[in-house]
Amino acid sequence: MAEWLASIMPNVVDYSGKFWSSCQATMQMFLIAGGFTLIFGSIFGVLLTVTKKGGIAENRFLYVLVNTVTNVFRSIPFVILLIFLIPLTRAIVGTAIGVKGAIVPLVFGAVPFFTRQVEAALANVSPGKVEAAASMGSGKLGIIFRVYLHEAVPDLIRAVTITAISLIGLTTMAGAVGAGGIGSFAINYGQNLHHQDIVNVCVVVLLLFVSVIQGLGNSLSRRTTNRSLFQHKVETK
């Protein structure tokens, strides 16, 4: 097996230590930045939903503030954002390179995208259900958690899936400018040294990673839709 691998991707075998460390760095960036993105993106998405005109907690100032900041950071290409945030990144984590240096720009790049995804998912919740909950005495937090977030679970899962796949792309771009990870490995040891097998393996690894995330997202989304749950109950009867 080892001889066969060495014959089809000799350079990957030679740099196997670097390859596995780059995979680990990519996973670290993805998980840490993804966690922050999930938290802050959900908060901002909910804020945009409830503070808009006609929302359950209408607040024009807060809505305009969050909406404007989201639009500003969404409009900046990620590579430019990486450079722009170098001073802030150094102030927060002490460095602008490596995995630690990539977390801040990754969060700033992914949160606005996920915020819009959450806002769109919550917009699909029927206003009638919100009004019904309010008429039964539910408070604002109750409506947010028991109506908006509960009813939008399938769409929110799709939003998380799309954002996770997008975040993988951002981690590879971050690697191209010194953050490490698979993107950095593909450029430094693949393209720069003309080792095509390294580039090919990096592409395959990323494709597998994306396919797993997409498959999990699709499965969870189907399982949490009312139609899927209804069909499951009928079949079990």
Walk through the language-model features, giving the residues of each.
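Membrane-water interface segments at the C-terminal ends of transmembrane alpha-helices
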Residues: W20-A123, R158-I165, V205-I213
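Short helix-to-coil transition segments within interhelical loops
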Residues: L122-A152, N192
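Glycine-rich helix-loop "coupling/hinge" segments at transmembrane-helix boundaries
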Residues: L170-N200, V205, T225, F230-K233
